[in-house]
């Protein structure tokens, strides 16, 4: 049984009740309602049963009174431990058609074809919603038609306005000019000198070597590129993870009188021989100092 509520109040001559999963008898419920509502001068009462999909029985009741009640007790219509859903019947004809669809209905009295007309304020609100073309116009129309609501419920009205007229995202305008975003020359030179165009991780995907070896390979390629192009050590070199890696000139295999070591070769043969370019050989797989 529901607890008493200070907010409950029923003031309608036309009432629609639904008793869900009710094990009572229909005729007993009908008699209970008739006796309970007699002081309000019953004009019509109809009670119908409905077999629900889960096998339980629902009871519906349409009540039409000649005298408007003022019921504050939410348990007023409770019957044998069953509490109904209570709501005003705004269209009695629709309610009667609904509850009598299964044909099992008991009635008493003269039915009134009653229908509650929409309030004039609802029509005014509908006009505002349908005719406003922007958020500003919507709020201005409400301010004109319903000044009290505008003054006391502006926060909720702005919320509904944003739902009707979603704000368009503003186009981003960068606070920086194009010249501000250009790389300064000293930073550009530092980047080209100290940073590779390919990361060490990307290099190891193509050349299966260790991290340290990959770093050494990239440094060697950068130095070699500068040397071949006659550039200084502070001049940027182009490196790529999948570029062709030059083999280091072999040692004794080139010439019988070639001197090996870290110093430059004095053999005319090796000095005039161009570097051998290989797509499969990396610095990590060839000797950095030649053959011993």
From Swiss-Prot:
Alphabetically ordered keywords of this record: Activator, Covalent protein-DNA linkage, DNA replication, DNA-binding, Endonuclease, G1/S host cell cycle checkpoint dysregulation by virus, Host cytoplasm, Host nucleus, Host-virus interaction, Hydrolase, Metal-binding, Modulation of host cell cycle by virus, Nuclease, Nucleotide-binding, Nucleotidyltransferase, Repressor, Transferase
Biased composition (Low complexity): 255-292
One function term, GO molecular function aspect: nucleotidyltransferase activity
Cofactor binding, note field: Divalent metal cations, possibly Mg(2+) or Mn(2+).
UniProt signal peptide: none
Motif mapping: RCR-1: 16-19
Mutagenesis / variant outcome for changing residue 171 to P: In strain: Mild
Enzyme class: hydrolase
GO biological process: DNA replication; symbiont-mediated perturbation of host cell cycle G1/S transition checkpoint
Outcome reported for the amino acid change (mutating residue 260 to I): In strain: Mild
Annotated residues for binding of a divalent metal cation: 50, 58, 60, 102
Annotated ranges, domain CRESS-DNA virus Rep endonuclease: 9-111
Location relative to the cell: Host nucleus; Host cytoplasm
Active site per UniProt: 98
Cofactor: Mg(2+); Mn(2+)
EC number: 3.1.21.-
Annotated segments matching region Binding to RBR1: 181-185
Effect of residue 181 to I: 20% loss of ability to bind RBR
Residues spanned by motif RCR-3: 98-101
Family (UniProt): Belongs to the geminiviridae Rep protein family.
Subunit structure: Homooligomer. Interacts with host retinoblastoma-related protein 1 (RBR1), and may thereby deregulate the host cell cycle. Part of the C- and V-complexes which are RepA-Rep-DNA complexes involved in the c-sense and v-sense transcription.
Descriptive protein name: Replication-associated protein A
Source species: Bean yellow dwarf virus
Lineage: Viruses, Monodnaviria, Shotokuvirae, Cressdnaviricota, Repensiviricetes
């Amino acid at each position: 049984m529901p607890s008493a509520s200070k907010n409950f109040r029923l003031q309608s001559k036309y009432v629609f009740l639904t008793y869900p999963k009710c094990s009572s008898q229909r005729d007993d419920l009908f008699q209970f309602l008739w006796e309970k509502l007699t002081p309000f001068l019953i004009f019509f009462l109809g009670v119908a049963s409905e077999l629900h999909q889960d096998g339980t029985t629902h009871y519906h009741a349409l009540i039409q009174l000649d005298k408007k009640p003022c019921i504050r007790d939410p348990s007023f219509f409770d019957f044998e431990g069953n509490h109904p859903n209570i709501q005003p019947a705004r269209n009695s004809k629709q309610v009667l058609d609904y509850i009598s669809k299964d044909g099992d209905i008991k009635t008493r009295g003269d039915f009134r074809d009653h229908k509650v007309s929409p309030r004039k304020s609802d029509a005014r609100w509908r006009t505002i919603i349908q005719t406003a073309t922007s958020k500003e116009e919507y709020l201005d129309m409400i301010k004109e038609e319903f000044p009290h609501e505008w003054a006391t419920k502006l926060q909720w009205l702005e919320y509904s306005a944003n739902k009707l007229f979603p704000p368009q995202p503003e186009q981003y305008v960068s606070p920086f000019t194009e010249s501000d975003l250009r790389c300064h020359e000293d930073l550009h030179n530092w980047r080209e000198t100290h940073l590779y165009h390919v990361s060490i991780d990307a290099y190891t995907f193509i050349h299966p070597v260790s991290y340290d070896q990959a770093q050494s390979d990239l440094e060697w390629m950068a130095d070699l590129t500068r040397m071949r192009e006659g550039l200084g050590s502070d001049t940027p070199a182009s490196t790529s993870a999948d570029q062709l890696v030059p083999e280091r000139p072999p040692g004794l295999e080139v010439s019988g009188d070639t001197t090996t070591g870290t110093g430059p070769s004095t053999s005319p043969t090796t000095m005039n021989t161009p570097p051998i370019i290989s797509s499969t050989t990396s610095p990590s797989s060839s000797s950095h100092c030649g053959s011993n």
